[in-house]
């Protein structure tokens, strides 16, 4: 099950108490203090785990506590330090304070390990409190308490390219054809219920990661449909690929305008992202001359509209994922766009 948001409770370990002890040996009647220090409590760390892309394991285990430090012993023996807790999260997980929603750390690189809570300091044994006025101190420090925090884990998948489109326009077919991703593909809306990542091998030396999210509908920024819940997963992408469908009721230009507006309402940053456009299902030539005329007319209308808006870096490509036409050209265009885009994580 895909889970991209969960809250958990974390606590570091308490420091161990210092010992009150006196040296006891044969022929030494009044030995001095020899109480050891308590061990420090364990810390709480968060670490990127590249072997997972979901927070589902946290649904059943929401409390994480490091071990307490052990008390000090005689003969100045220090107590054992408490074991740390290491919480492993997917790449792209943000750690926030649950109450204030303030960002604590963004786990956006791998490898990466960050200490969230330090364990309590162990108490000093009575050895430290001997002085001229008190040769046999009977006092030792208690260990300091650990820290506690209620945190929110928010996963934002990291990809180079984010697919954007209405439901059932061919996004899942496209990503499954280009990459190793295997989303469900069927002829009904909202086939894609969760985000999918796929690695596209562009050539012998280059590859990029593509993200497919559930389809967006008009009004998504206000909570309609499924796409709004997953738009955060394309916020980190360096490039957006709009998938438009000539078979829809809206024209190609209208589709792009609706999708762009929903992205801008969700995050103004997304509206500034470099993008390209693919026209899916361009293999429907068997529908006759009327379809071909409609396709050419709407494509020209979209090109003129984008030219007026001043988007020189964008491209428009007709493709067919079923017949695999236009896909090599698409990968080439995406690769070029990523290479000139500083936000890319191109490998």
From Swiss-Prot:
GO terms for molecular function: GTP binding; GTPase activity; magnesium ion binding. Gene3D superfamilies: GTP1/OBG domain, P-loop containing nucleotide triphosphate hydrolases. It holds the Pfam family MMR_HSR1. Keywords: Cytoplasm, GTP-binding, Hydrolase, Magnesium, Metal-binding, Nucleotide-binding. GTP binds at residues 165-172, 190-194, 212-215, 280-283, 320-322. Mg(2+) binds at residues 172, 192. Residues 1-158 form the Obg domain. PANTHER family: DEVELOPMENTALLY REGULATED GTP-BINDING PROTEIN-RELATED, MITOCHONDRIAL RIBOSOME-ASSOCIATED GTPASE 2. This is GTPase Obg. The lineage of its organism: Bacteria, Pseudomonadati, Campylobacterota, Epsilonproteobacteria, Campylobacterales.
């Amino acid at each position: 099950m895909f889970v991209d948001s969960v809250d958990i409770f974390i606590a570091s370990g308490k420091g161990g108490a210092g010992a009150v002890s006196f040296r006891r040996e044969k022929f030494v009647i009044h030995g001095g203090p020899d109480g050891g220090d308590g061990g420090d409590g364990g810390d709480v760390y968060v670490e990127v785990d590249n072997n997972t892309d979901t927070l589902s394991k946290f649904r059943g285990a929401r409390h994480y506590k490091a071990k307490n430090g052990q008390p000090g012993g005689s003969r100045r023996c220090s107590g054992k330090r408490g074991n740390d807790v290491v919480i492993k999260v997917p790449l792209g997980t943000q750690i926030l304070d649950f109450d204030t929603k303030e960002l604590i750390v963004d786990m956006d690189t791998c490898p990466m390990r960050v200490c969230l809570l330090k364990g309590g300091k162990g108490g000093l044994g009575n050895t430290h409190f001997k002085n001229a006025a008190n040769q046999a101190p009977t006092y030792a420090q208690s260990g300091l308490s650990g820290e506690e925090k209620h945190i929110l884990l928010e996963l934002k998948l990291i990809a180079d390219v984010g697919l954007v489109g209405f439901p059932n326009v061919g996004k899942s077919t496209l990503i499954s054809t280009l990459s190793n991703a295997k989303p469900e593909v069927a002829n009904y809306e909202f086939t894609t219920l969760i985000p999918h990542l796929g690695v596209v091998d562009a050539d012998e030396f280059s590859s990029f990661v593509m993200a497919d999210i559930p389809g967006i509908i008009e009004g998504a920024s206000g909570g309609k449909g499924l796409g709004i819940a997953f738009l955060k997963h394309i916020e980190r992408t360096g490039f957006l690929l709009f998938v438009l469908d000539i078979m829809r009721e809206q024209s190609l230009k209208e589709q792009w305008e609706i999708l762009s507006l929903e992205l801008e309402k969700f995050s103004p940053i997304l509206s500034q992202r470099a993008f390209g456009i693919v026209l899916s299902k361009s293999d429907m030539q068997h529908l006759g001359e009327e379809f071909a005329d409609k396709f050419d007319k709407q494509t020209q209308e979209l090109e003129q509209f984008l030219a007026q808006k001043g988007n020189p870096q964008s491209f428009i490509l007709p493709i067919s994922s079923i017949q695999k036409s236009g896909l090599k050209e698409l990968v080439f265009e995406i690769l070029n766009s990523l290479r000139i885009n500083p936000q890319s994580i191109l490998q």
